[in-house]
């Protein structure tokens, strides 16, 4: 019953609930307990929601569909603040939740007693988290986690999730996911619990890859007209936000809504400057709000064919009669270069990977996905399970200071005060 209590900051701003679940048992190898411990504390009822001035019911002043728990000044309501402060540390409940998340099993009786009877439960709990992170079951859970995050898996579609899991399990720099230039299509042997490095054989020479950005299975899975599905996959999986990716000062372009991208209006193609698709259309929505960024990213993926193989020519089509092959001017006019963001050019996929690896939003996205995993939330995109930046910022700092070791972040979150209090 931690769904109404764990991190009210996140609940108040995103409406996300956290729940625990059950699974089969697993015997871990841990020391025997030596002293008796107290039983698990129980939770009372959640506090009464804020009411309006007349006291006749809960309010939803901001119209977001959730009862207000933050007053107009931006301060958490006293009732909810009190509830947050009333949480108690329960390493037994935390151990159960962590074991289910990290191994897919319940903790063994020995593990439960080890924490329950330990002179310093916090230390004992941390030791068991370390054991879980070294367990082969964690590797399998990590692969499943990245299958879900990447929206792909099974057979050749496992190479990208397996590479991400390898970086996590082996405690490597996680930015290699976007920058590694070789051995980016590893395999995993479940029986032996081993990763085997392997090259992605799709026409790109070894030493010229860019992590999963050149993965053939990814390119095959998200093949589409103008490579827009590939660009969308990159944006949503690694930046944790949909298009439009960038917001600038509103500009009147003669439509019902303003143009809001930071790019110049004519930085992308339309039928008025050489393109065959009118990305300058303003008759309904302002297409360029999304396409200002998207059109600078998508051409980088246009030379992968429908099987994910690299070609010397553009291999994606236009959604027009007879499906003609796209040309560069369908995305960008003469003089424009591909880019990750405004003022961040990326002339090739390796440059794109480097720009993404240095992006604070990409750093925060990786940490947010771990946070949602730990707290039992859904996908930040598919389930719109957003997390306020201030909630994950301490762990983003940990991620940076550890040279982008995502495993360090996993441990930090699973041992965090907010994870062990109920």
Positions of PLM-derived features:
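Extended surface/linker regions that mediate inter-domain or inter-protein docking
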Residues: 124-297, 357, 385, 394-405, ...
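Short, solvent-exposed loop/turn and secondary-structure capping segments
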Residues: 109-114, 157-161, 245-250, 297-306, ...
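Ser/Thr-rich, Pro/Gly/Ala-heavy low-complexity intrinsically disordered linkers and tails
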Residues: 18-84
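Sec-dependent bacterial lipoprotein signal peptides
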Residues: 1-20
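Electron-transfer interface patches adjacent to heme c in soluble/periplasmic c-type cytochromes
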Residues: 77-87, 218-227, 269-275, 279-282, ...
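N-terminal module-boundary/linker segments of secreted carbohydrate-active enzymes
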Residues: 74-108, 112-118, 132
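Residue-level detector of buried hydrophobic side-chain packing
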Residues: 21, 42, 55, 98-99, ...
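Long, charged, low-complexity terminal extensions
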Residues: 93, 98, 137-146, 358-361, ...
């Amino acid at each position: 019953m931690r769904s109404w209590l764990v991190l009210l900051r996140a609940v108040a701003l995103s409406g996300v609930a956290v729940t625990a679940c059950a699974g089969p048992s697993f015997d871990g190898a841990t020391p025997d307990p030596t002293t008796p411990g107290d039983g698990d504390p129980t939770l009372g009822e959640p506090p009464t929601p804020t009411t309006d001035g007349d006291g006749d019911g809960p309010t939803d002043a901001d119209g977001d569909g959730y009862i207000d728990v933050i007053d107009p000044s931006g301060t958490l309501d006293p009732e909810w603040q009190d509830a947050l402060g009333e949480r108690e540390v329960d390493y037994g409940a935390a151990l159960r939740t962590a074991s289910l998340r990290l191994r897919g099993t319940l903790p063994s009786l020995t593990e439960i007693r080890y924490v329950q009877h330990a002179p310093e439960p916090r230390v004992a709990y941390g030791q068991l988290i370390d054991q879980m992170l070294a367990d082969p079951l964690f590797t399998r859970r990590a692969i499943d986690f990245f299958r879900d995050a990447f929206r792909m898996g099974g057979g050749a579609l496992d190479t990208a999730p397996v590479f991400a899991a390898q970086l996590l399990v082996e405690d490597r720099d996680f930015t290699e996911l976007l920058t590694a230039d070789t051995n980016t299509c590893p395999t995993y042997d479940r029986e032996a619990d081993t990763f085997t490095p392997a090259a992605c054989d799709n026409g790109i020479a070894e030493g010229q890859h860019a992590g999963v950005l050149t993965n053939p299975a990814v390119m095959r899975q998200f093949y589409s007209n103008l490579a827009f599905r590939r660009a969308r996959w990159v944006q949503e999986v690694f930046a944790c936000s949909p298009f439009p990716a960038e917001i600038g000062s509103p500009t009147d372009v003669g439509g019902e809504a303003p143009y809001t991208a930071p790019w110049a209006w004519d930085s992308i193609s339309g039928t008025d400057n050489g393109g065959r698709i009118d990305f300058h259309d303003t008759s309904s929505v302002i297409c360029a709000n999304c396409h200002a960024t998207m059109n600078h990213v998508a051409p980088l993926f246009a030379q992968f064919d429908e099987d994910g193989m690299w070609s010397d020519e553009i291999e994606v089509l236009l959604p027009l009669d007879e499906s003609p092959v796209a040309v560069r001017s369908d995305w960008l006019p003469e003089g424009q270069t591909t880019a990750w963001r405004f003022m961040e050019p990326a002339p090739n996929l390796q440059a794109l990977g480097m720009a993404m690896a240095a992006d604070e939003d990409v750093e925060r996205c990786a940490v947010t996905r771990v946070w949602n995993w730990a707290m039992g939330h859904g996908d930040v995109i598919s389930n719109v399970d957003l997390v306020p930046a201030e909630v994950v910022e301490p762990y983003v700092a940990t991620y940076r200071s550890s040279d982008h070791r995502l495993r360090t972040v996993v441990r930090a979150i699973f041992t965090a005060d907010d994870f062990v209090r109920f």
